[in-house]
Amino acid sequence: MASGGGGCSASERLPPPFPGLEPESEGAAGGSEPEAGDSDTEGEDIFTGAAVVSKHQSPKRATSLLPINNGSKENGIHEEQDQEPQDLFADATVELSLDSTQNNQKKMPAKTLISLPPQEATNSSKPQPTYEELEEEEQEDQFDLTVGITDPEKIGDGMNAYVAYKVTTQTSLPLFRSKQFAVKRRFSDFLGLYEKLSEKHSQNGFIVPPPPEKSLIGMTKVKVGKEDSSSAEFLEKRRAALERYIQRIVNHPTMLQDPDVREFLEKEELPRAVGTQTLSGAGLPKMFNKATDAVSKMTIKMNESDIWFEEKLQEVECEEQRLRKLHAVVETLVNHRKELALNTAQFAKSLAMLGSSEDNTALSRALSQLAEVEEKIEQLHQEQANNDFFLLAELLSDYIRLLAIVRAAFDQRMKTWQRWQDAQATLQKKREAEARLLWANKPDKLQQAKDEILEWESRVTQYERDFERISTVVRKEVIRFEKEKSKDFKNHVIKYLETLLYSQQQLAKYWEAFLPEAKAIS
């Protein structure tokens, strides 16, 4: 159509004058104002002329047109369109030149037409921050909330007995009714809390910290056996594990706001948790569902569009394997340290017996004092074995379970993606069925087919949004998990090294004190 403009070149066609310009610019533009007939029949040439003129204008001049154009849009269209119809086209020329998507047929470089306002240009050119940058900009989650678990108490006799723990909470958060309160909870209550949180949040991609594992042997000893050192050791291990578990729960901003968490911490009596036993009627279907999920996960082959998720999943799987190997070695270390403590105690007793039967007074005194030193060293070995377990072995055990939950979050994202893909496949089948109905000329079933297509189109859109949402949540949760893991490992390793240093210092102190006695033997 541009070639039918009466042989007029594009450089000679200028847009109509803008109201409010300087006198000299009005005079320059008025000399080449196009006729009304040209504007009505060949409106596309107006855009071409506007594009060429904009190339000859300076950026400063182009920017100054914007506020005037806004005034023209308000006044020229609504108040003066009867008197000056050319202003309508002039306004349309500037408006359409801003939108490059409407003039794709002309292939005009939109950036050369007119410059954006400073604020809009800044916003459009500013790169979007990554998730890592957003996490670093945010302040660390600091909740004035401390939960302690103390006083494990056996209630009842025989196999019906159970252990209740005192859960004490100290906080200044307005979410809770008071600053300090305490309740009694049994182990099944902790498991029930995890079941509730997992049911609500895991399907959305959140990493719900897992509770400590069950121990049928340890609990049976506590229920049936007498109170001995092994039962006390088991209860202390479980108490510490439950305390770490509940502290991780309240440190998570999403979990902290959950009403089930507040109810667990505040309410005096909770309804009995059902289905938490492995061999219960409600526990068997859960085992079956887990096996079914494992099989279905093996059959899903996801075409990963984001390399970040693929790399992170590989990192998580490799880290879990390495932690399992390290945990096995640390458990061996703990057992060897306990054996060393027992052997040191036996050695101390033998030295004491030898010293009591020795005739040489100086030698007898030296042997007796050496036996005392060995008893102190046996105590150091026992304390260090406990430190090996609580500071190192339990840390590794916790993160092995946590990494399994992280993998479950990736699996949940994969299941959401698969649901989206299945919906797309179903939608395609519905459309093919509609095409067959059209081909067979069956109008009675056509409306139902169209309704089903609309329904599945809505589902596909919703499932796509669900996938995008869970991808965002999983990414943020993994980044948060890695930060928490780094802090956790740093704190525990520092404490562990401090215990090793203290143990070595005490050993040196004991031997330095004993050395004069050994030299005094005559």
Swiss-Prot record:
It holds the Pfam family Vps5. Its main location: membrane. Residues 35-45, 132-142 have a biased composition (Acidic residues). GO terms for cellular component: cytosol; early endosome membrane; endosome membrane; Golgi apparatus; lamellipodium. A 1,2-diacyl-sn-glycero-3-phospho-(1D-myo-inositol-3-phosphate) binds at residues 186, 188, 214, 238. The modification N6-acetyllysine is found at residue 237. It comes from the Eukaryota. The BAR domain is able to sense membrane curvature upon dimerization. Membrane remodeling seems to implicate insertion of a N-terminal amphipathic helix (AH) in the membrane. Involved in several stages of intracellular trafficking. Interacts with membranes containing phosphatidylinositol 3-phosphate (PtdIns(3P)) or phosphatidylinositol 3,5-bisphosphate (PtdIns(3,5)P2). Acts in part as component of the retromer membrane-deforming SNX-BAR subcomplex. The SNX-BAR retromer mediates retrograde transport of cargo proteins from endosomes to the trans-Golgi network (TGN) and is involved in endosome-to-plasma membrane transport for cargo protein recycling. This is Sorting nexin-1.
